């Protein structure tokens, strides 16, 4: 993506995998609902600085990929270095869908092997080519370099985020077949994983406070959002709220009630004024129950105005039509005569504004496994102005606008109903074979931990 505004070029989801100057990817963990070989091959090349052919020749796993079992297997020859790991028992999985989209990447310096960096990415979009080409999505990221652990103030919160991500991936590792990662050192890269583990533990020892990153293994996403807003000692009643989601409750269930629930709860916690301005951003071509709820939402107190999501020109100057897929809440105070977003906070994550995505804890038949962050951005402005950096303008950072709404008479489409797909990729009896040399040749043996 290119932008002429102040020379600012927003980072694409694939570019978040780029190794920093002087570094190369050591090992990484990625989870999500879906991924494809095209995206993951690009991500692995950016991460390792090796081409597809070079990675195939090296034969080493650099990224462990956990996806919903409905995602077809991504074969190692199609994305060398990426091990798409199958779930152990799809029928007993502790979530409706694996929907959390998180990456934890570790890089080692090319010359000074004592220097390293950890990167955490939280995305609203899937790890697919479609996300890059057709969707409106957002991502949040932090980088922690090894030098930062040596007495730098303010590193505790970022380290707490790493701790939360590590806990999630450790939990997933117990529920997916990781035998391939235990293959011989050339393939499974156990040495790389062990050195990265020491880096993560070094961060965990510096962790302080409540992490911005959270998931819904214990309680629903919305409960986690509210708890963080209250615990952060920032109980301020804002007068603006923007909500956005790529998916809502099915139209067959009647008018949408979850947007009203969000507003009601924020008001009751004194995080939103009773006379606030509230916008709900949707994909007009597929907004499920919102398509039949515009009048009812507008009649609510405070009124909830349904608006089509915007494509930030700074991010998409080509103006190609994209469908909203991002899930977000953004709230701040707006003051007459000021362009500053006062007391802002934002939720970004995988959880759609649905019952399974936002109001339920993860469970086999009720809640998806979701993950997100609550952040308090500093220096954010409402609109583009002269001398205001483009990366500080909220309409460049989120797909929101205030010029157009979906008036009750405007035609909105609910789109096709969606139901969880059948599981396809489950752990086989044998995960891999090892080649054992003999003086007269060799033989294939089932990998360690496999059973015939």
Regions found by a protein language model. Give the residues of each.
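PLD/PLD-like phosphodiesterase catalytic module centered on the HKD motif
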Residues: 1-452
């Amino acid at each position: 993506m290119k932008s002429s505004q102040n020379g600012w070029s927003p980072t694409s989801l694939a570019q978040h995998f780029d190794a920093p100057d002087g570094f190369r990817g050591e090992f990484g963990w990625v989870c999500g609902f879906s991924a494809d070989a095209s995206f993951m091959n690009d991500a692995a090349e950016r991460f390792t600085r090796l081409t597809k052919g070079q990675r195939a020749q090296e034969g080493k796993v650099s990224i462990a990929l956990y996806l919903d079992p409905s995602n077809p297997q991504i074969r190692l020859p199609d994305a060398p270095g990426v091990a798409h790991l199958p779930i152990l028992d799809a029928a007993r999985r502790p979530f409706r869908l694996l929907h959390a989209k998180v990456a934890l990447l570790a890089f080692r310096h090319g010359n000074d092997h004592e220097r390293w960096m950890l990167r955490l990415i939280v995305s609203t979009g899937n790890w697919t080519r479609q996300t890059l080409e057709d969707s409106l999505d957002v991502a949040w990221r932090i980088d922690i370099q090894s030098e930062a652990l040596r007495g730098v103030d303010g590193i505790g919160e970022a380290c707490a985020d790493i701790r939360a991500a590590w806990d999630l991936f450790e939990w997933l590792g117990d529920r997916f077949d990781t035998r391939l990662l235990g293959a011989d050192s050339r393939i499974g890269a156990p040495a790389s994983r062990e050195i990265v583990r020491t880096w993560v533990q070094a961060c965990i020892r510096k962790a302080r406070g409540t992490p911005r990153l959270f998931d819904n293994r214990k309680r629903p996403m919305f409960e986690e959002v509210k708890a963080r807003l209250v615990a952060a000692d920032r109980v301020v009643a804002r007068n603006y709220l923007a909500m956005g989601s790529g998916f809502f409750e099915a139209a067959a269930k009647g008018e949408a009630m979850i947007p009203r629930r969000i507003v009601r709860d924020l008001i009751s916690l004194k995080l939103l004024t009773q006379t606030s301005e509230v916008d709900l951003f949707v994909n007009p071509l597929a907004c499920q129950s919102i398509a039949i709820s515009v009048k009812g939402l507008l009649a609510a107190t405070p009124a909830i105005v349904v608006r089509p999501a915007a494509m930030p020109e700074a991010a998409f100057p080509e103006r190609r039509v994209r469908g909203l897929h991002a899930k977000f809440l953004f709230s701040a105070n707006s003051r007459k005569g000021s362009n500053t977003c006062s007391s802002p906070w934002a939720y970004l994550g995988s959880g759609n504004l649905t019952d399974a995505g936002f109001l339920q804890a993860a469970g086999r038949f009720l809640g998806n496994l979701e993950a997100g962050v609550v952040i308090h951005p500093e220096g954010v402005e409402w609109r583009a102005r002269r001398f205001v950096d483009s990366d500080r303008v909220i309409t460049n950072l989120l797909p929101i606008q205030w010029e157009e709404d979906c008036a009750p008479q405007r035609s909105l489409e609910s789109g096709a109903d969606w139901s969880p797909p059948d599981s396809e990729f489950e752990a086989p009896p044998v995960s891999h074979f090892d080649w054992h040399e003999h003086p007269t040749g060799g033989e294939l043996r089932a990998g360690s931990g496999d059973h015939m």
